[in-house]
């Protein structure tokens, strides 16, 4: 699942990115509300947004208002100061789904985010399917021919990204940027290692290969005829 973070405190922004990425989310982050609006206008692929209320240029409440004015039901979690009662009330009245006061524990952030996604607001919560492979983003459950497949958070994020783009060849750069959330440096074999592990877990009982190598490009997930 893909989450947008808008937080102007650089240190907290980096922490949020790391926490969500480690939990298996694809993350885009920005430092002000204007950037957040530009991200939101460029794609409708986000499953949730985490917005700091107090940001430069455009504040979090204005971003939230614009989201709701467009008719979007995107789940929104507001980050607020402990004494910002009026802002929290205004945010909830504008259509925020929840809020979290600073400072907060990463476990609580993740729990609140999971709760938002469970409530049905995520646009991409439908079960993904390719051949006999099933991935449920909401329950984070993967099965192959009815067999449960245990995946790490990163393996789950990789498989989800490939299933959302089934049939489309994906370069290593695309995979690293979307799943690992850092710029591609070249020379790294991290994608190849994870693909090999994922194949092993999906083909443990001799099932047909679904993740194929595309020479000089990268990988593609598709069902062979």
Residues of each region from the PLM?
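Conserved amphipathic alpha-helical interaction elements at protein-protein interfaces in regulatory
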Residues: 22, 26, 42, 69, ...
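N-terminal/domain-start alpha-helical segments
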Residues: 1-123
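Intrinsically disordered, low-complexity protein-interaction/activation regions
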Residues: 223-225
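DNA-recognition alpha helix
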Residues: 175-181
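DNA-recognition element of transcription regulators
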Residues: 105-118, 150-160, 172, 186-204, ...
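Short, Lys/Arg-enriched segments at the junction into DNA-binding effector domains
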Residues: 2, 114-173
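Active-site phosphate/pyrophosphate-handling residues
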Residues: 59-62, 89-90, 157, 174, ...
